A protein has these predicted regions:
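Periplasmic/cell-envelope proteins involved in peptidoglycan metabolism and beta-lactam response
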Residues: 1-186, 194-200, 204-211, 226-231, ...
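Beta-lactam-recognizing serine transpeptidase/beta-lactamase-like catalytic domain environment
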Residues: 160, 164-211, 216-451, 461
């Protein structure tokens, strides 16, 4: 009898320990697990906190369900404009974006579980918290409109802090359609769209950068002391790839200058493929790779969701000068995200310091009190301040007298670099990166359009991406002066 009593006692002890683990110690872990059916059900019906922009625009909110006084309906007032940033949360199709990344902060804890009751007894606020983001709503809307009908991306960053001012992937989708009883069929329709609107082209897709990568190569050349803006290079019509019968030519089919020599400054202004291909081989893969890494290449950049890593594969290029020459002009093996190239522009604008991009500036409670406040951080120093000044001056010349003139803004000093990459014949990815004003940078930007944008195979970075970038920077700067 004593043995039976002991077994019963031990059984109750184990049961109590298990309940304590699941209901108290392990509650948060199991509650946040997406496989938890109860969590999935609660996502759609429980109150969630606000997601708000820096200028007070509400992007996500929970409204009382008119059919169920105990439930709430999630609503996205800006719909497609912020879809890739805010994401969605749905019992039927899951979650994405900030809704997923800040799941724990945004959700209500008033579930009346044992752990919630205990937390409330100790004074914990069980109401949902709210998320304040750095995006400028008007700039975001303007960027979405600029890319309407096209496949591409715009990323804008405040150079001194890394605050993300715009994060746009086009085409987009309406996250409101992923809510309610038709969520599954609506999401499937979006997934079946050949333009792939759910793809995050701004931060999770990789592209050849074309000639915007020449800014990185130029930085490597100047920082190493190998060249300055007035250093001269041979100016051939074509560059013969080492160990190959293939050649690289310039966009117009001729030399960049007089056909004898050309300066580094002019080579960047006119985007000379021949000069930068040769320069890349001379510098070597390691030197370029080190500079690229200091901008954020080949490393994980902290962000609310996992970004694709931009790559400059040093080990693959170190013993392949032909591939290095092609990669040095932004083709072949180098791949980037638009966010990464916005960081390149931001680092040059920020006197050589590459800012850590951040999207959430603050998490605040239901009483409006800040619980978490973002502190600007750096990825690292990409170049010395002196080198940054040289790059700023050379890139300003690109806009005043080179391939980026369509990005110019009346009365504002603008710096930039154009790019046109050819991942497939007749399907150019067109680019512009830049910043303004040069003397006191407030915005750095990257614009990329697939397939030449509205001009198709005749599109270039200068004709398509640069005017979009210029217009968006002007809109932001002018409003800043008047607002």
């Amino acid at each position: 009898m004593r043995r039976i009593a002991t077994l019963v006692f031990l059984s109750f002890g184990l049961l109590l320990a298990a309940l304590t683990w699941f209901q108290v110690l392990g509650a948060d872990r199991y509650r946040s697990d997406p496989r938890n059916v109860r969590t999935a059900i609660n996502i759609s019906g429980k109150e969630r906190g606000l997601i708000v922009t820096s200028d007070g625009t509400v992007l996500a909110q929970s409204n009382p369900d008119p059919d169920d006084p105990q439930a709430y309906l999630r609503v996205y007032p800006e719909g497609p404009t912020f879809a890739h940033v805010v994401g969605y949360t749905s019992r039927l199709v899951g979650e994405s974006g900030l809704e997923a990344a800040y799941r724990d902060e945004l959700r209500s804890r008033r579930d009346l579980t044992i752990s919630d009751v205990i937390a409330a007894l100790f004074g914990r606020d069980l109401r949902p918290e709210n998320v304040l983001i750095t995006i400028d709503a008007e700039l975001q809307r303007a960027a979405v409109a600029a890319l309407e009908g096209q496949r591409g991306a715009v990323v804008a960053i405040e150079p001194a802090t890394g605050a993300v001012l715009a994060y746009v992937s086009s085409p987009t989708f309406d996250p409101n359609s992923f809510l309610g009883p038709s969520a599954v069929s609506n999401r499937q329709a979006v997934l079946d769209d050949p333009n792939e609107p759910t793809r995050d082209r701004a931060g999770t897709e990789l592209y050849p950068p074309g000639s915007v990568f020449k800014a990185v190569v130029a930085a490597a050349a100047v920082e190493s002391g190998f060249a300055g803006p007035e250093t001269t290079f041979d100016d051939p019509v074509v560059y013969e790839l080492p160990g190959s019968t293939s050649t690289i030519g310039n966009a117009d089919g001729g030399p960049c200058g007089d056909g004898v020599t050309v300066t580094l400054q002019t080579a960047l202004v006119r985007s000379c493929n021949t000069v930068f291909a040769s320069l890349s081989v001379t510098l070597g893969a390691s030197a370029i790779g080190d500079t690229a890494s200091s901008f954020g290449f080949d490393r994980r950049i902290d962000f609310p969701w996992t970004l694709a890593e931009s790559t400059f594969p040093v080990s693959d290029l170190a013993n392949d000068p032909a591939a290095l020459a092609q990669s040095g002009i932004g083709e072949r093996d180098v791949r980037v995200t638009p966010l990464q190239m916005a960081l390149v522009a931001a680092a040059i604008a920020n006197d050589g310091e590459a800012p850590q991009p951040y999207l959430v500036s603050q998490v605040f409670n239901a009483d409006g009190e800040a619980r978490e406040v973002a502190e600007p951080r750096l990825i690292g120093r990409a170049m010395s301040p002196a080198t940054a000044v040289v790059l700023q001056q050379m890139m300003e010349r690109v806009v005043t007298s080179g391939t980026g003139q369509s990005a110019s803004i009346t009365g504002v000093r603008v710096a930039g670099k154009t790019g046109t990459a050819l991942p497939e014949p007749g399907q150019p990815d067109v680019w512009f990166i830049g910043f303004a004003p040069v003397d006191a940078p407030q915005i750095a930007i990257a614009v990329m359009l697939e397939d030449g944008g509205p001009l198709g195979e005749s599109g270039t970075g200068g004709s398509v991406a640069a005017p979009i970038a210029g217009a968006l920077m002007e809109r932001y700067l002018v409003r800043g002066e008047t607002g």
